[in-house]
Amino acid sequence: MQANFPIAGIMPFSATDWPGKLTASVFTTGCPWACVYCHNPALQDPYGETTATVDELMELLASREGLLDAVVFSGGEPTMHRGLPVVIREVRRRFPALGVGLHTCGYLPSRIHELVDDPTSRPDWVGLDVKALPETLPGVVGCTPAGARNAWESLNFLAEASAAGLLELQVRTTAWHGGILEEQLPRLQEEVASRGLDLVIQWAHDVDSDGHYVGV
């Protein structure tokens, strides 16, 4: 099938990308942000190397039918690509028993609205990375203040969708010991809790005191 959806890699089996589910996890090229602790900076390039086609993804899912609970679209940032809803619809058409998950940083709220508002492209579960409070976010990911506002608009929209029973939502953040994000965790937890959700905290590994990735 034809879809603007560049795939940088596929993990055929994963037990860590959707809590409680065994998934195939699809990683797209391209990410608009440059998180200081990013372990996969090669995926930030939207024109980076691809390793599989959408047809090959469908073949893999067919070969594992009955073994997987779901497919998760991750990145990079999958909402960058116009082909995402097309691919989700094709998964639902071919594999109606398979759940669909999405990892996103929320920087494109309009596209998240489009996905969720259409039942044929709506994810069953979303893992939303709330990287920082709005005023801190530009320094952590290299976005503009407008980009930070967009990310929090996505949080508000997805929290409402979750409360309405349209999808499951996990909100998570990444922090490192001794950094500004660790200091702000209590406030970030309060902000997420005010939307009826819990914040999952992931601790960055192989980073320096400023959070920059130093691993090999």
Segment roles from a protein language model:
Residues 41-72, 82:
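Conserved alpha-helical substructure of the radical SAM core
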Residues 8, 27, 172:
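Residues in well-ordered beta-strands of folded domains
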Residues 58-67, 80-215:
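Conserved AdoMet/S-adenosylmethionine-binding subsite of the radical SAM
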Residues 25-27, 70-74, 101:
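Short, conserved beta-strand segments within well-ordered enzyme catalytic domains
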Residues 11-52:
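Canonical Radical SAM [4Fe-4S] cluster-binding loop centered on the CxxxCxxC motif
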Residues 77:
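Conserved G/P- and acidic residue-centered "switch" motifs that form tight phosphate/ATP-binding loops
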Residues 1-12:
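N-terminal "domain-start" segment that seeds a small globular fold
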